[in-house]
Amino acid sequence: MVSKDEKPKQSGLFSVESLLETPKQKCREDLPKPTPITPKTPMLIPGLHPMTPYFGAQLDPVMIYFAQTGNRLPIVSSDSSPESCASSPLSMQHSLQWLSSQREDSPTSDDAKIQIGLSKCMLRKHKNNRKPRTPFSTQQLISLERKFQSKQYLSIAERAEFSASLQLTETQVKIWFQNRRAKSKRLQEAEVEKVKFAQASAYAAAAVGGAPDPSSILAFYQPQW
């Protein structure tokens, strides 16, 4: 026999509160607890460089999933600013892309513009300041060439007298003689190269056979300078 005092206790087991609370507790106990994923080694995320601030940091499980599966990360809309993108780990790739595009699309800095302007001004100034060539007359050129053939270097007194006879300044005569000596040197070097080339060709032909003596060929070649 069950005493009257024990009936309320038994009836309490089947009350509405006990029936509602028991499934909740069982469901909570049966649910598997998620194990925290903490990679021991730094995880490489596609699109991120190892030297970025996010490398080696605590990563979100969703980020690890996309990194392991090779799927592309969701990209945030381009309307978002870099401050809002940086707050979410999933938008790191978009942030880097946004920064790189901003860096590429950014106009030339003021310093670079100033340097370009200065270089252009210097080139333009140098070009405008170049003195025009002295328009020598035909008679003056003939006299200068004759004087150069007789003497390539003039003394100060000779240059003063010669420039006065041609109605030219001493500087003009001096510069003309300098340029003429440089031209004569170039012509001599070109003639030497021609002689070397002819000699090499003659020896090559003699080595093949059937060609005359190279010395007989070079005897007809008279360098002119």
Curated annotation (Swiss-Prot):
Coiled coil: none annotated. One of its GO terms (biological process) is locomotory behavior. It is found in: Nucleus. Residues 1-44 are annotated as: Disordered. One of its GO terms (molecular function) is RNA polymerase II transcription regulatory region sequence-specific DNA binding. Residues 129-188 bind DNA. PROSITE patterns: HOMEOBOX_1, HOMEOBOX_2. Residues 23-32 have a biased composition (Basic and acidic residues). One of its GO terms (cellular component) is nucleus. Expressed in the ectodermal cells of embryos and seam cells and ventral cord motor neurons of young larvae. It comes from the Eukaryota. Its main location: nucleus. Keywords: Developmental protein, DNA-binding, Homeobox, Nucleus, Transcription, Transcription regulation. Pfam families: Homeodomain. Disruption phenotype: Worms exhibit the absence of AVM, PVM, and PLM touch cells, defective egg laying, embryonic or larval lethality, cell degeneration, malformation of the posterior body, and uncoordinated movement. Belongs to the Msh homeobox family. Probable transcription factor needed for the proper production of touch cell precursors. Involved in specification of lateral neuroblasts. Essential for embryonic morphogenesis. This is Homeobox protein vab-15. It comes from Caenorhabditis elegans.
